[in-house]
Amino acid sequence: MSDTVLGLVLVAAGYLAGSIPFGVVLGRFVLGVDVRQVGSGNIGATNVARAGGKKLGIAVLLLDAAKAIVPILVARWLLAGTPRAELFTVLVALAAFVGHLYPVWLGFRGGKGVATGLGIFLVLSPWAALAGAVTYGVAYGATRISSVGSLSGTAVCVLGTFVAHGWTSPVSWAGLALAALIVVRHRENIRRLVRGEEKRMRV
């Protein structure tokens, strides 16, 4: 198998891994509910936490991050030493992210990408991920609004990625693409924030 074919296979596998809807799976098996029918209807950690408590929300967050981390690490291992290793590793990361947003298993209706994006940043730009996580904690702690923390943390992650990797790195531009998609997926949250109607978390 050529390096290019292997890279494309890994990209496809990354998408399928990213498509695994852990929020829906845990919601059904642990809570006996479809999380798409409760709260905000989102399949991510925040809505699962609202429906089933903080511990279940954290479990979904970790699993949603892991479904990006694992494919990226596998791609790095299998593509090590090949000419397009960095490019295909970044494409695997993007594929896992797109899989979470548009999962084939759920009719292409997925989550908002924050936890999966965090998993990607943790592997590709760890210091940027750390800065983003701290920013999320501060912003969320100050407002108790998850979307404020998510958007703030994402912005810092992207800035940190460009600082760490420069303007010519595929990692930096992949980070910018992730951030743009996260903002798009949060457009309703942004509208509610502008109107002062975004809900605060109580878990």
UniProtKB/Swiss-Prot annotation:
Compartment(s) where it occurs, according to its Swiss-Prot or TrEMBL record: Cell inner membrane
Known role: Catalyzes the transfer of an acyl group from acyl-phosphate (acyl-PO(4)) to glycerol-3-phosphate (G3P) to form lysophosphatidic acid (LPA). This enzyme utilizes acyl-phosphate as fatty acyl donor, but not acyl-CoA or acyl-ACP.
Main location class: membrane
Pfam family, one: G3P_acyltransf
Reactions accelerated catalytically: an acyl phosphate + sn-glycerol 3-phosphate = a 1-acyl-sn-glycero-3-phosphate + phosphate
Keyword Lipid metabolism: yes
NCBIfam families: glycerol-3-phosphate 1-O-acyltransferase PlsY
CC per GO annotation: plasma membrane
Protein name per UniProt: Glycerol-3-phosphate acyltransferase
Keyword Disulfide bond: no
Gene Ontology BP annotations: phospholipid biosynthetic process
Pathway annotation: Lipid metabolism; phospholipid metabolism
Gene encoding the protein: plsY
PANTHER family: GLYCEROL-3-PHOSPHATE ACYLTRANSFERASE-RELATED (PTHR30309:SF0), INNER MEMBRANE PROTEIN YGIH (PTHR30309)
